[in-house]
């Protein structure tokens, strides 16, 4: 493909394919960044801010890879880490918005179910049916909120003169009407990592049993070894998965900008792009 061709939106499969290619081609460098991020996350507050910034750094790098305008990691890192505390504040704010929204819906749903119980009785099948419907509605509301804010860190990481709250507003604007596409992308991503996730669960379950054969399970040494290995495994697995999801986020951010704004550029995304769906 030539460099002069105008960039186009990606299909759902195209987003996944692009994210996987970026993840594969830059695995070593992204894994190193993610490993640092998870090691920093052990330290309260400052470490959490570093984790947030380094996570966003991977998304930024993936975004520019999608544009075929790769950045030098050290330069991108210095730009992102200057907003370290903004990333932490944004993460807290997003968490509060999601929890507040779900809490409000739960309270309203609980009151409504309580009224139904008072009118119809606790053992009435209609009460259970409506209660289940409210639960499903709250679950979908949670998914909707998460989808609307999934790329909130990307505008803060990429765009100039951006604040934490403006990044959330930007994500809200870009994801309008795109919740189903985003969920389709995330669902396919989940299916891709599912085998590894199952393997990790098996390791976590059987690891204490394996150590129990070597070391007395009642000893303090056994507990120390198991805890240390559990922390190490969680860090390594997190460092494996984080670049994958951030690569996907970077490509989603690119795709949404193309769809919403046209991104009047003469640069191509990575080669296996497809028409949007």
Label each region the model flagged.
Residues 112-134, 207-228:
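Membrane-interfacial helix-loop-helix connectors in multipass membrane proteins
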Residues 55-64, 92-112:
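Specific transmembrane helices
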Residues 91, 95, 135-139, 231-238:
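Hydrophobic alpha-helical transmembrane segments of multi-pass small-molecule transporters/permeases
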Residues 102-114, 197-208:
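C-terminal TM-helix exit segments that contain a strictly Trp-centered aromatic cap at the helix terminus
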Residues 1-7, 16-18, 51-71, 145-162, ...:
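Juxtamembrane transition segments at transmembrane-helix termini in multipass membrane proteins
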Residues 44-48, 128-144, 234:
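Alpha-helical transmembrane segments
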Residues 3, 7-40, 71-101, 143-198, ...:
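Interfacial aromatic "cap" segments that immediately flank transmembrane helices
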């Amino acid at each position: 493909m030539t460099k002069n061709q105008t960039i186009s939106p990606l299909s759902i499969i195209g987003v996944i394919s692009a994210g996987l290619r970026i993840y594969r081609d830059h695995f070593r460098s992204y894994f190193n960044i993610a490993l640092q991020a998870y090691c920093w996350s052990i330290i309260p507050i400052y470490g959490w801010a570093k984790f947030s910034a380094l996570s966003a750094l991977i998304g930024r790098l993936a975004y520019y890879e999608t544009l075929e305008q790769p950045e030098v990691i050290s330069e991108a890192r210095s730009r992102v880490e200057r907003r370290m505390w903004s990333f932490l504040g944004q993460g807290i704010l997003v968490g509060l918005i999601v929890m507040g929204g779900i809490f409000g819906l739960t309270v309203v749903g609980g009151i409504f179910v309580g009224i139904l119980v008072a009118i119809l009785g606790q053992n009435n099948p209609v009460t259970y049916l409506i209660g289940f419907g409210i639960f499903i509605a709250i679950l979908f509301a949670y998914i909707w909120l998460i989808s609307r804010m999934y790329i909130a860190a990307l505008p803060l990481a990429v765009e100039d003169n951006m604040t934490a709250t403006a990044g959330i507003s930007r994500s809200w604007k870009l994801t309008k009407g795109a919740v189903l596409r985003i969920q389709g992308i995330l669902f396919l991503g989940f299916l891709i990592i599912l085998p590894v996730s199952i393997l990790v669960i098996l390791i976590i379950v059987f690891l204490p049993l394996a150590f129990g054969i070597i070391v007395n399970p009642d000893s303090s040494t056994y507990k120390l070894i198991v805890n240390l290995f559990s922390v190490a495994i969680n860090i390594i697995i997190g460092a494996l998965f984080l670049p994958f999801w951030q690569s996907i986020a970077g490509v989603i951010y690119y795709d949404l900008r193309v769809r919403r704004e046209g991104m009047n550029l003469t640069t191509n995304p990575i080669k296996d792009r497809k028409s949007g769906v």
